Amino acid sequence: MTAQYIDGKAIAAQLRAEIKAEVASLREQGIVPKLAVILVGDDPASVVYARSKEKAAANLGIAFELFTLPGDTTEAALLALIERLNADAAVHGIMVELPLPKQISKEKVLEAIHPLKDVDGVHPLNRGYLMAGQPGLVPATPMSCMELLARSGVELAGKRVVIIGRGETVGKPLFFLLLRRNATVTVCHTRTKDLAAEVRRAEIVIAAAGKAGLVTGEMIAPDAVVIDAGINEGEDGNIVGDVKTAEAAERASLISPVPGGVGACTTALLFRNVLFGLKLQGGMAHE
């Protein structure tokens, strides 16, 4: 048996179409969703990411403004800009590109963004809302995992799910998202005594450890669903996930590849957060 591959690019296209339609509807009402992105310094990867978001925003009809600050910007100056954007009713989402220069505290900066404009979903209040089952903004990568499962017709209620990785932006949020869908969830991490045994018991495996090839084919239970949220540089310089995909595909029923799986949807979901944040700011949001 060979697994069916989940087409993340096709799902991303569906998401973009849905977002584009919602943006068009908002614009007809005179509401223009807007994302502000702050870039401090000239880190090449950050510049590329910022410009790719600008292009994606234009394709969706979402207004976009990039604030480029020099690398020697003070923490106080950056916090002052964030405060100004927090107070600007025309801005519905704020994102700060990472990494930041060493003179600036990442924690202070991310916590300074208004929770309802925190499209990365990393503010402590948004984490708390997720834990409490209340409407809030959730990081894009765990949302992408959930979208791949939902749009592939995978039932979660009562299923044994193993998450590999307990990071703040993927593993932990996924735990609460899956609980919300009535899954039975185990989180494995670096101190887990027998990872292979835990994974073999899972009907759904979500790998988010950031370690290339951590999950081998022999760990996967027959007919399990495998979602690979890992992004690593392989020995040949190409991007690979946490799962040995070809091996796992021999046993799984459904598997997401890297690239072309989870990562394909994250930018679209970032912009969906802009729209959800807009609704939260207007008191219109429902879970």
UniProtKB/Swiss-Prot annotation:
Keywords: Amino-acid biosynthesis, Histidine biosynthesis, Hydrolase, Methionine biosynthesis, Multifunctional enzyme, NADP, One-carbon metabolism, Oxidoreductase, Purine biosynthesis. One of its GO terms (biological process) is methionine biosynthetic process. NADP(+) binds at residues 165-167, 190, 231. GO terms for cellular component: cytosol. Its EC number is 1.5.1.5, 3.5.4.9. Pathway: One-carbon metabolism; tetrahydrofolate interconversion. One of its GO terms (molecular function) is methylenetetrahydrofolate dehydrogenase (NADP+) activity. InterPro entries: Aminoacid_DH-like_N_sf (IPR046346), NAD(P)-bd_dom_sf (IPR036291), THF_DH/CycHdrlase (IPR000672), THF_DH/CycHdrlase_cat_dom (IPR020630), THF_DH/CycHdrlase_NAD-bd_dom (IPR020631). It comes from the Bacteria. SUPFAM superfamilies: Aminoacid dehydrogenase-like, N-terminal domain, NAD(P)-binding Rossmann-fold domains. It catalyses: (6R)-5,10-methylene-5,6,7,8-tetrahydrofolate + NADP(+) = (6R)-5,10-methenyltetrahydrofolate + NADPH; (6R)-5,10-methenyltetrahydrofolate + H2O = (6R)-10-formyltetrahydrofolate + H(+). Homodimer. Belongs to the tetrahydrofolate dehydrogenase/cyclohydrolase family. PANTHER family: C-1-TETRAHYDROFOLATE SYNTHASE, CYTOPLASMIC, C-1-TETRAHYDROFOLATE SYNTHASE, CYTOPLASMIC-RELATED. Catalyzes the oxidation of 5,10-methylenetetrahydrofolate to 5,10-methenyltetrahydrofolate and then the hydrolysis of 5,10-methenyltetrahydrofolate to 10-formyltetrahydrofolate. This is Bifunctional protein FolD. It comes from Heliobacterium modesticaldum (strain ATCC 51547 / Ice1).
